[in-house]
């Protein structure tokens, strides 16, 4: 049995993955994370029990639990209770159904080496594909608890046993923990786990490469694997629903591209559960509560024309009272965004800074845009945040502009950030996304600026440009799942915003060429030529490099928390001008500066040359090293807090 809190990061429960338990108890007195609930449900064997310890019915949620959704200037009292009431109603329905049930849930038979007959067929199909013609790509998609990973491992074990000569088989996954089930069932075959970022170090191509939980990996990285080893037999497996992620990015982007290739991929699926019975009541209850089956609304074939769609703001009390509308909303979000998670359900229902804008054709929801209101902070609070003092939850746009882009005053502006935007697949390319954005602009006419932060693609950047937005910052690393750098785009709505944000476009024009080169050296720039072109073409003239602007930028980097790559265009010339002072620094600090700033070496080499244990240590060492060089250059303390021009 496992006893755990209902709140906290989902990763806190992931250590139990792979276990099959008689019972899991979630103490939900302080609150209940949908992601933790989803994980817990998947741990319980057929015939077992998931126990939720809830406070008395209709009791107010614990303020400590509500605080997780608080964003300045809101308090716990401003957080909604819609998710909590939905949970109470769902628990009541489950208890009533159980009280009137005539039979207990079926207990599946004991697990056999081949699992279900369906799994045995999939194992044989995997063996056939992975021992067949070179260059074959195989895709295995399954829901949780279907034996996907064990099927992969069993297939690898049998491939080794049947092979006339030794095979080089490699497994990769988001983490070693995520691959343990494959490796366990592959034993005793000599299958090696290699992290995704270490695959480049392989001296020879593997005969077979298995990618488990592929939806958790960047799509460009998956595409690159196919291009790098065209003759290897590759198998991509992923979970399509649940806490592992919806898998929509994998299906909508990677698999769609793979289907256009020659030869097309061999597609397999697993539907029958192994650890519990078909139509298991606990799985059905969790699916319904967490909207795992959510799909966009059904549209009539000869329905109304898209241009007649009605724009409006969704009332969240009415939304939670209408299961059909709530499911349609999440169906839109899940189908359009690979990052949608079960915890987004709580945020959409209860976060006090969110507004949901919608487009409807008749009764059908055909578009949605989630907006977060941010900023409006005091100048003192902004200055402290820019110095790295404290954290700002829920203000992603304001925080990025202040602490990363160097526009400290941006936090004082009232901002409206587009968190998600989605349009029904059946009516895309009909101007509805632009209609949504126009509606947002009209509804939030009192804000200083509109903005959005997203994994950059040429198509979305162009769309935002048509809506009047401009890129003002590009992230310095690839997104964990998109594989693309993030981009910040803003549209000014008041003269004050235009004045405050004016330096950002020329600053990005100055920063981006060197930033991109440094990211490419690290393997973090997966942007295609189209994205690179659309970003570069829209930039303003680069900000001039004067003695004052360089000194201000270096002081901002040294005194804050912004990553080096975004400020390298200023730090490098300043260090070059003061290189004579490096010998006076601590040898390790001087080595880090010489390797990263002057030689532009990748972080891994910087760590090696400076005698540091790894990349994170090298990255942490650079800022204090530059700060020490600033002190040697005898810059005044006041200059370190100035905002760069």
Where are these regions (language model features)?
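Conserved RecA-like ASCE P-loop NTPase motor core of nucleic-acid helicases/translocases
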Residues: 1-4, 138-141, 166-179
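Conserved beta-hairpin
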Residues: 353-372, 379
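Conserved coupling/interface region of RecA-like P-loop/ASCE motor cores
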Residues: 70-121, 245, 255-298
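Terminal substrate-recognition subdomain of acyl/acetyltransferases
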Residues: 196-200, 208, 220-224, 232-338, ...
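Conserved RecA-like ASCE ATPase "motif II neighborhood" in helicase/translocase motors
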Residues: 7-39, 189-228
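Hydrophobic positions on the alpha1 helix immediately C-terminal to the Walker A/P-loop
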Residues: 151, 155, 436
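N-terminal accessory nucleic-acid engagement/regulatory domains that precede
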Residues: 14-105
């Amino acid at each position: 049995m496992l006893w755990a809190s209902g709140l906290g990061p989902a990763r806190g429960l992931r250590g139990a993955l792979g276990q099959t338990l008689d019972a899991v108890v979630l103490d939900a007195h302080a609150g209940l994370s949908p992601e933790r609930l989803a994980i817990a449900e998947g741990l319980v064997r057929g015939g077992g029990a998931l126990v939720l310890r809830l406070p008395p019915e209709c009791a107010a949620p614990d303020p400590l639990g509500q605080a997780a959704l608080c964003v300045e200037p809101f308090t716990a009292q401003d957080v909604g209770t819609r998710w909590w009431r939905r949970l109470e109603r769902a628990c009541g329905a489950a208890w009533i159904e159980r009280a009137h049930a005539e039979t207990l849930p079926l207990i599946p038979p004991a697990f056999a080496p081949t699992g279900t007959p369906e799994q045995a067929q999939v194992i044989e199909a995997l063996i056939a594909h992975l021992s067949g013609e070179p260059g074959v790509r195989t895709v295995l998609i399954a829901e949780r608890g279907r034996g996907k990973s064990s099927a992969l491992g069993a297939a690898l074990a049998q491939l080794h046993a049947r092979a006339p000569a030794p095979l080089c088989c490699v497994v990769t996954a988001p983490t070693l923990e995520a691959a343990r089930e494959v490796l366990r069932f592959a034993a005793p075959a000599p299958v090696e786990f290699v992290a995704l970022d270490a695959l480049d170090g392989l001296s020879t191509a593997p005969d077979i490469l298995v990618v488990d939980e592929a939806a958790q990996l960047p799509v460009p990285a998956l595409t690159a694997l196919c291009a790098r080893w065209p003759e290897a037999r590759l198998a991509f497996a992923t979970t399509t629903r649940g806490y592992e992620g919806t898998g929509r990015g994998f299906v909508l982007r990677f698999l769609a591209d793979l289907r256009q290739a020659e030869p097309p991929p061999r597609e397999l699926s697993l539907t029958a559960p192994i650890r519990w019975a078909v139509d298991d009541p606990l799985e059905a209850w969790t699916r319904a509560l967490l909207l795992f089956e959510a799909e966009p609304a059904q549209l009539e074939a000869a329905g109304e024309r898209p241009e007649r769609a009605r724009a409006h703001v969704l009332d969240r009390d009415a939304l939670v009272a209408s299961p059909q509308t709530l499911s349609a909303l999440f169906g839109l979000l899940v189908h359009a965004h690979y990052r949608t998670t079960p915890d987004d359900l709580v945020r959409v229902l209860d976060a006090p800074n969110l507004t949901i804008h919608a487009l409807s054709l008749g009764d059908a929801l055909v578009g949605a845009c989630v907006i977060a209101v941010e900023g409006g902070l005091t100048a003192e609070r902004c200055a402290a945040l820019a110095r790295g003092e404290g954290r700002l939850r829920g203000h992603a746009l304001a925080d990025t502009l202040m602490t990363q882009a160097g526009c400290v005053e941006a936090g004082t502006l009232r901002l409206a950030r587009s968190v998600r935007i989605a349009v029904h697949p059946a009516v895309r390319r009909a101007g509805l996304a632009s209609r949504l954005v126009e509606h947002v602009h009209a509804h939030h006419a009192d804000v200083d600026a509109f903005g959005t932060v997203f994994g950059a693609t040429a198509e979305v950047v162009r769309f935002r440009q048509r809506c009047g937005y401009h890129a003002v910052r590009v992230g310095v690393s690839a997104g964990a799942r998109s594989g693309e750098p993030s981009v910040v785009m803003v549209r000014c709505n008041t003269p004050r915003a235009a004045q405050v944000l004016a330096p950002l476009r020329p600053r990005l024009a100055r920063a981006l060429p060197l930033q991109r080169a440094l990211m490419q050296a690290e393997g973090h720039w997966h942007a295609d030529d189209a994205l690179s072109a659309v970003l570069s073409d829209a930039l303003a003239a680069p900000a001039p490099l004067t003695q004052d602007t360089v000194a201000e930028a270096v002081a901002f980097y040294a005194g804050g928390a912004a990553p080096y790559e975004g400020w390298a265009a200023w730090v490098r010339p300043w260090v070059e001008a003061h290189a004579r002072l490096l010998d006076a620094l601590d040898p390790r600090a001087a080595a880090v500066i010489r390797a990263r700033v002057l030689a532009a070496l990748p972080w891994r080499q910087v760590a090696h040359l400076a005698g540091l244990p790894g990349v994170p240590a090298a990255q942490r060492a650079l800022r204090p090293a530059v700060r020490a060089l600033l002190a040697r250059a005898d810059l005044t303390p006041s200059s370190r807090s100035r905002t760069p021009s």
